[in-house]
Amino acid sequence: MRAPGAGAASVVSLALLWLLGLPWTWSAAAALGVYVGSGGWRFLRIVCKTARRDLFGLSVLIRVRLELRRHQRAGHTIPRIFQAVVQRQPERLALVDAGTGECWTFAQLDAYSNAVANLFRQLGFAPGDVVAIFLEGRPEFVGLWLGLAKAGMEAALLNVNLRREPLAFCLGTSGAKALIFGGEMVAAVAEVSGHLGKSLIKFCSGDLGPEGILPDTHLLDPLLKEASTAPLAQIPSKGMDDRLFYIYTSGTTGLPKAAIVVHSRYYRMAAFGHHAYRMQAADVLYDCLPLYHSAGNIIGVGQCLIYGLTVVLRKKFSASRFWDDCIKYNCTVVQYIGEICRYLLKQPVREAERRHRVRLAVGNGLRPAIWEEFTERFGVRQIGEFYGATECNCSIANMDGKVGSCGFNSRILPHVYPIRLVKVNEDTMELLRDAQGLCIPCQAGEPGLLVGQINQQDPLRRFDGYVSESATSKKIAHSVFSKGDSAYLSGDVLVMDELGYMYFRDRSGDTFRWRGENVSTTEVEGVLSRLLGQTDVAVYGVAVPGVEGKAGMAAVADPHSLLDPNAIYQELQKVLAPYARPIFLRLLPQVDTTGTFKIQKTRLQREGFDPRQTSDRLFFLDLKQGHYLPLNEAVYTRICSGAFAL
């Protein structure tokens, strides 16, 4: 875009003509002619097409910044902000459990969280102490971390799918002095009890399973019934920059990391979602996402705690109950993540899916290939796709419904929100730098790593990192925008078009090179899944001895062993370039996913195409014969020895 140079030329021409004594109208017309002739027409086109979008985005940014500044100056925290909501509407429904039908008003949520605060203060816990929470999503989950926050304590929110080593690891790295777990988690806690420190105090909440209560465990619910529901007599001196709780990364590439969430980050994330998608106080939000992650607990529950919306919780997503729940509770906003939209499209068409009042679906991970199919089939007017990790400072949002886009950054005023796509080595993901040692910005259409400039004094740009200092340092680069600055490295590759819309490409490590070409796992997964009726698919690269690059491998869910590999190949030939067609197929009962419905590839990549590592059906694409062959140990040996041409 040549707007800066064109603008300078037009200003110079305007000054010269004015000095010559020509009327200002003639001078302005001549300057405009120079501007357009110098390439400025591109900038004018961008202004015309994006001004409305950018002005709305700017208004959201300003609004969130002003709200945050007001709360910071007043010394508020999330519990203090929630207290104001309770005083405004004590009897309005705050949380509804769709699984049990249990309803909590704002006054009841306030009383429960007060009981939690008073109890843990009486038990000797102090501000700054960490308490781990390990139970399924229900109103008590919110009341527990909110109550701990009222007492100045910090919750570590554990993924309920963790077991054995990962569970013990997360508990150990959290520094928790106590563990609150649900009755449904007794067996999981029992498995790691021998690895937990003797000083860890354990509390169990909810109905006990057949295992009964574990040794040295206190029943929490009776203790809470005896605790005072009045506000704490002494409110801890906390502010918006203090820690609220810890959320663990999904662990798709290894053991989870504890991301630090401060009060201002919680507020910022919830506020951006609220204003960017024009949520209203009368909205009812359906939240079937895990509460141990930010989408469910901040973007979703945050609308309740900060803005007073009613939030309907379901502890686990159910494709068959989704629209029935929305109809029953008059939901107007729903959340999605990962593959949820695809799972809904897999359901048989029925009348109920159009009788709802849902106008907005907010989330991330909606594949462009099914975007319009989802909106047309279910009658949802707006998709609020966004991009952003729990800890990142470069979140973006699609505010105007651009199909396939996960957000935008203004081309008119790019420095208002200092994020950027920068060039990287596509094999190593190493930052590429210019002669001055600065990162090289990508041009429109060029894929690059998303980075955000860090300013710890600005709540919109700060990066709080992880409990692990080494993990934090790995996410920071220096001299990115300017000499000596610091920037957050998202680890994600996006591409921006000429109008500033950004599109998610791949998480770093999810692209691989084969036959001199870059293969996008996201693209191949989308194509395969669509061909197979929205089946779960994981695509990744595997190393083959003596062969440059990585060969594509696709793991496909085939629980009833009905898929024909060669029928799949016939279809792939029509829609994928030769280098993108998977060389190896793995047909398995189900594809592993995380708690947020993201495909889990770590185990699959480790096992590769070695038939000794799995009992799943494996196939190899014989290019000479033009079809897939069963891959047994003999074929595996021949591939590794170079007998087959890849």
Curated annotation (Swiss-Prot):
EC id: 6.2.1.15, 6.2.1.3, 6.2.1.-
GO MF assignments: arachidonate-CoA ligase activity; biotin transmembrane transporter activity; efflux transmembrane transporter activity; fatty acid transmembrane transporter activity; identical protein binding; long-chain fatty acid transmembrane transporter activity; long-chain fatty acid-CoA ligase activity; nucleotide binding
Segments on the Cytoplasmic face: 35-646
Tissue: Highest levels of expression are detected in muscle and adipose tissue small, intermediate levels in small intestine, and barely detectable in liver. Expressed in brain gray matter.
Catalytic activity: a fatty acid(in) = a fatty acid(out); (9Z)-octadecenoate(out) = (9Z)-octadecenoate(in); hexadecanoate(out) = hexadecanoate(in); (9Z,12Z)-octadecadienoate(out) = (9Z,12Z)-octadecadienoate(in)
Main location per the UniProt record: membrane
Superkingdom, taxonomy of origin: Eukaryota
Extracellular side: 1-13
GO biological process: adiponectin-activated signaling pathway; biotin import across plasma membrane; biotin transport; export across plasma membrane; glucose import in response to insulin stimulus; lipid transport across blood-brain barrier; long-chain fatty acid import across plasma membrane; long-chain fatty acid import into cell
Role this protein plays: Mediates the import of long-chain fatty acids (LCFA) into the cell by facilitating their transport at the plasma membrane. Also functions as an acyl-CoA ligase catalyzing the ATP-dependent formation of fatty acyl-CoA using LCFA and very-long-chain fatty acids (VLCFA) as substrates, which prevents fatty acid efflux from cells and might drive more fatty acid uptake. May act directly as a bona fide transporter, or alternatively, in a cytoplasmic or membrane-associated multimeric protein complex to trap and draw fatty acids towards accumulation.
Family the UniProt entry places it in: Belongs to the ATP-dependent AMP-binding enzyme family.
Protein name, as recorded: Long-chain fatty acid transport protein 1
Organism ancestry: Eukaryota, Metazoa, Chordata, Craniata, Vertebrata
